[in-house]
């Protein structure tokens, strides 16, 4: 695949729902058992309204978009920057909106911006910028 013969979309949107079950599964996969992510009472002691989703779980969802949708198969991340604006809590549906902001034929790559908003209230949760090799 290359930039000149691409057939991937310039924009893509997908909704992911964060669940407590996802947090438990992710803790087992990653070995990160920080109670902030797994224990509601502990999270509340720290001032949060509920358990806080793993940042790396969000990155896994970003990987789904990059590897399967925009640009898709054969894509390889070379750079990722992400900023979380608000915590993501269990039972929250998050709308991921991806758009290509730049293409380079020289490096056969794209720059991709992906933002995450709560599906219900449209609160901005994170912004990310990536360089993806095609």
Features from the language model and the residues they span:
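Hydrophobic residues in beta-strands and at strand termini
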Residues: 18, 84, 132-134
């Amino acid at each position: 695949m290359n930039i000149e013969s691409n057939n991937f979309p310039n924009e893509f949107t997908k909704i992911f729902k964060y669940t407590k079950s996802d947090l438990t599964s992710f803790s087992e996969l990653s070995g990160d058992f920080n109670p902030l992510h797994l224990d509601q009472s502990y999270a509340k002691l720290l001032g949060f309204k509920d358990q806080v989703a793993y940042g790396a779980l969000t990155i896994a969802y970003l990987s789904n978009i990059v590897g399967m949708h925009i640009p898709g198969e054969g894509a390889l991340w070379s750079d990722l920057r992400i900023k979380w604006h608000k915590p993501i809590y269990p039972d929250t549906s998050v709308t991921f909106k991806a758009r290509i902001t730049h293409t380079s034929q020289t490096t056969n790559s794209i720059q991709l911006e992906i933002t995450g908003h709560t599906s219900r209230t449209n609160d901005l949760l994170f912004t990310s910028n990536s360089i993806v090799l095609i």
